[in-house]
């Protein structure tokens, strides 16, 4: 993950939505519609690059399996929601 790509990805989402989605990967919280739409607008490549970066950290590595699954499910749910808004 190049630092330029990473920086561009992080700028594509508000800090509130970034926090909401981060917490979702570890806990049963709801991701609101606004954040879902921001996620899809950010793009799949950015989302999964950022998620992979989180779970490559020793601090979060133990939660990688469930977190990666939750992030994939979230992406799919948000993509469906975004299609409904097109």
Model-derived regions: residue spans:
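Mature extracellular/luminal domains of secreted and GPI-anchored eukaryotic proteins, especially small
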Residues: 1-86
